[in-house]
């Protein structure tokens, strides 16, 4: 039986006296849709940040396709694409260039990324805006750009 896409066991994380996560267990198999719901401060973002290596866990294990998110960071990060709530991009560059930058973060050369960037811009209805800056896009277009950014390295897992 193949490893789950995501497996979290006994995950704990504290920020000082605040226990953001206290023994979280999650198992998501490949092909499943999963919703992580909760009120503000429930630890949703902390869980995602631990999975992607932005935050270190205090205790427990976090695996992506059976590989540890800390000891095998590059592999696990390459398998996840995130369409973040916040826009953490350089607002100066055109969105097409930002997608090439994002691909480059994953070691994808520009010539290899070009077909994917073009396809994403077209499929998400952003091809006519490829030279626009993020600040020039509508709210919906900005969300579609975030999705393109999450997909540009062809990850197996998408976190929205």
Residue positions per predicted region:
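Conserved catalytic motifs of ABC-family nucleotide-binding domains
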Residues: 154
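Conserved ABC ATPase "signature" region
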Residues: 100, 104, 111-129
